[in-house]
Each structure stands twice: as C-alpha cells, then as structure tokens.
A protein has these predicted regions:
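C-terminal catalytic core of tyrosine-transesterase DNA break-rejoin enzymes
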Residues: 71, 75, 81-82, 160, ...
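Active-site/catalytic core of tyrosine-dependent DNA strand-transfer enzymes
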Residues: 121-168
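DNA/chromatin major-groove-contacting recognition/catalytic segments
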Residues: 56, 115-118, 212-231
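Basic, Lys/Arg- and aromatic-enriched nucleic-acid-binding interface segment
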Residues: 2-10, 21-80, 84, 188
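Conserved tyrosine-mediated DNA breakage-rejoining catalytic core shared by Y-recombinases
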Residues: 34-43, 49, 85-131
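Catalytic-site neighborhood detector that most strongly recognizes the C-terminal catalytic loop/helix
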Residues: 37, 44, 105-107, 127, ...
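Short, polar N-cap/turn motifs at the start of nucleic acid-interacting alpha helices
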Residues: 90-98, 168-169, 189-209, 220
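Short basic/aromatic active-site micro-motif
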Residues: 7, 65-66, 148-152, 168-188
Length: 231
C-alpha cells in the first residue's frame, strides 16, 4: 500500500541526506518529490476494552509492568518516548494540590522545536502507577518516573496482554495515546482544543482526526442498531 511505500522511502531519504552531508552525492534525488500517505484510522480501545485491561492482574512481572506503562499512557496521552523519558522534574503540583505533567515532546525536541508542551492533569490511575514504581531500582538509577522497557518488547508483551483480555485488536504502544484522545477525553466531552493542548499538538487540526474517527464509529454503531431493529 501507499503508506508502506512512503515509510520505506522516508528511510531511503535519511540515507541520501546522510550521503549528501558527507558529499558522497551531489544532488538530492528526492528534490521535488512529495510523500503523501493515505489517512488511516488509529487503533484505540473502547471503554470496555480499557476496563478489561485495568481489571486484569498478571502474575508474570513483565506483563504487569507493561500493563501499567500502557495504562499510564492511556490516561495521560503521552507517547511512548515521552513516558520512557518522564522525570520527577516534569511533575508539578498546582495551588490546589493537584499534580500535572508539563513536558516538552521528545520527538519535537530532537527536531529543536521544543515549543510543543504536553500539559496534562494527572488522574488517579496514573498517579497510583507513579506511586507504585517511585522506589523501583531502575527508576532510582536512571532518575526516571517509570521503569520502561524498549518499545519492541512492550509491543510484544501487549499482544500477550490483548490475548489474555480477549481483545482482538493489534495492540501497540501507539494505541494508548489514541485511546486517551478518543475514549478517555473526546468521548467524555472534553473540548477538542483542550485535548489538543494535553496531547501537545501544534494545532487542533492534528487532533480533529480523532474526532472524525469517533463520528465514524458512532455512525457504524448506529447502522448496526438500525440493522438489528430492521429500520
């Protein structure tokens, strides 16, 4: 599909950029070439699926850890890279005693665009997870808030978690951020502009895609109702 082609072309472009920087190539073969991807719907959990994971306790430590990391992202909207680099200095308490995450997004910082800040009030679920791991040896050694495993391992373990919880979706770390944007916030009538601010989006245009997905899902569900009732 076009998106797969674009993904490979982006990798190739990085290589050619490196070659140009080292003067191995004189001209940019990608000059004037536009990479356009097809819009795809993000994978996210429904409320029932989210509750299924929350209510499941694992005897296997690696699964319990990844479950907690995933739920933390579901209730904060942080990308996996931001969760793994979250440090105590990114946590702030306001005058009312409530805790917030105020953190520049990692992806944008690497591009030297640190103006995009994830600004998220902490709900009881992520607060409890932070408390659970505050004395974890890895956290104490690295100065991080959570002992996050690598993305590849996390995605592998999430597939096991999905199987245990009877979830048929392709569960990855990306699904947590998508779940926050849809099931946790927009589905509970949090204004689009506020969701955009918490996600650290540069504009609400980036967030509107989630709202369109919610509308399509609602329409599909109503079509099922119409079919069952013979309307």
């Amino acid at each position: 599909c076009r998106n797969t082609i674009v993904r490979y072309m982006k990798c190739l472009k990085k290589i050619t950029n490196m070659a140009i920087a080292k003067e191995w190539m004189r001209k940019d073969p990608f000059y004037g070439y536009k990479m356009e991807q097809d819009e795809t719907d993000p994978v996210f959990l429904t409320n029932n699926e989210l509750q299924a994971i929350m209510n499941r306790e694992f005897d296997i430590p690696r699964l319990e850890l990844v479950k907690d990391i995933f739920l933390f992202a579901c209730f904060t909207g942080l990308a996996f890279a931001d969760v793994s680099t979250l440090r105590p200095e990114h946590l702030e308490q306001d005058n009312n005693g409530d805790w917030w995450i105020r953190k520049g997004r990692v992806k944008l910082e690497r591009r030297r665009k640190s103006s995009s800040i994830a600004n998220v009030p902490l709900l009881p679920v992520p607060l409890a997870i932070l408390k659970k791991y505050e004395s974890h040896p890895i956290c104490l050694k690295q100065g991080t808030c959570l002992p996050v495993v690598c993305n590849q391992k996390a995605n592998s373990y999430l597939k096991e978690i999905a199987d245990f919880c009877g979830i048929k979706k392709n569960l990855t770390t990306h699904a947590a951020r998508h779940t926050f944007a849809t099931t946790v916030t927009l589905a509970n009538n949090v204004p689009l502009q506020e969701v955009s601010a918490m996600l650290g989006h540069a504009s609400t245009r980036m967030t509107q895609h989630y709202a369109r997905v919610m509308d399509r899902n609602l329409k599909d569900n109503m079509n099922i109702v119409r079919s069952k009732m013979g309307l």
